[in-house]
A protein has these predicted regions:
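Extended, aromatic/histidine-rich regions of cofactor-dependent oxidoreductases associated
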Residues: 2-35, 39, 214-260
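An N-terminal structural lobe/cap that precedes and organizes the functional/catalytic core
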Residues: 3-107
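Conserved aromatic-histidine-acidic binding/catalytic patches
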Residues: 64, 131-134, 138, 187, ...
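Alpha-helix initiation and N-capping motif
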Residues: 70-73, 95, 109, 113, ...
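Internal, conserved structured core segments that host functional sites
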Residues: 110-175
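An internal, amphipathic alpha-helical element
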Residues: 166-239, 252
């Protein structure tokens, strides 16, 4: 039996410097047929693997797909059980996240940590509307508590109105980075990076990871501007569909990091 997901490999060359892009390129190819009946989580040396008919799942780069906890591995197992005629990575966000972590982030975790910190330097929560007053008030009421929370971590962020760039202090980014660096597991970093890029806010991502806010509340906080615009002008169907798809990715990332 071939290695699971080997048909998803896009090529042997991993020339991309970005470890996330490098890992994701391995997962872009013709979809393999579902060839298994039973999906189980099995304890192995160093963690927990997902077995298909008794054989361990491997990543596109042929590494063992292993997670540190049984509950995290079960999230991936659920996705394999849900596959029907083919194995479709597009419907397997947790599996993609773990593959990215193992094949990419584990090789260069510092690059991913630095990318999250770059988001912190231009965090969504730091850029406020100057009008209309209703939106200004909504942002203040909903975003300020997380800005205050970040300050309790030693990260004092500077706010700005409009689109003018504001430089965050080295002290704020350093303090924020100390708390991010506590998440050393590549899968945790993958989850944090996913939540950060989907929301545009490293503060929201860290707050979810630390249990300060729920994933659902964090997602709502990230869309205050969008929701206000929808209230004024109505919903765009295509934008709503894209948001719904991103929300699935967001909730899975939050669920995985909580299960580690």
């Amino acid at each position: 039996m071939r290695d699971t997901l080997s048909d998803l490999e896009a090529g042997k060359q991993l020339s991309d410097e970005n470890p996330i892009i490098r890992a994701q390129k391995l997962m872009q190819a013709q979809l393999p047929k579902r060839f298994y009946e039973q999906v189980e989580v099995a304890e192995v040396e160093g963690g927990f693997a997902v077995h298909l008919d008794g054989r361990p799942v491997k990543t596109p780069a042929r590494s063992l797909l292993m997670l540190p906890t049984a509950s995290a591995a079960e999230i991936v197992a659920e996705e394999f059980r849900a596959q029907e005629k083919v194995i479709d990575p597009g419907k397997m966000p947790a599996t993609r996240l773990v593959n990215t972590a193992i094949d990419g982030i584990a090789q260069d975790p510092q690059a991913v940590l630095e990318d999250i910190l770059r988001f912190a330097g231009t965090d969504l929560l730091c850029y406020r509307a100057d009008a209309p007053q209703e939106l200004v008030s909504r942002q203040t009421a909903r975003w300020d508590p997380l800005i205050d929370w970040a300050e309790t971590l030693g990260a004092r962020f500077t706010l700005a109105e409009g689109v003018m760039h504001v430089e965050q202090s080295r002290e704020a980014i350093t303090a924020f980075g100390i708390h991010l660096s506590a998440f050393t597991d590549p899968i945790a970093l993958a989850s944090l990076h996913t939540m950060t890029t989907l929301t545009g806010s490293a503060i929201i991502a860290l707050a979810i990871a630390k249990g300060e806010v729920s994933a659902e509340d964090g997602w709502t906080l990230a869309h205050i501007d969008e929701d206000w615009t929808t209230e004024q002008w109505g919903e765009d169907a295509e934008a709503a569909a894209r948001r719904k798809a991103r929300a699935v990715e967001m909730m899975i990332a939050a669920r995985v990091i909580k299960a580690l």
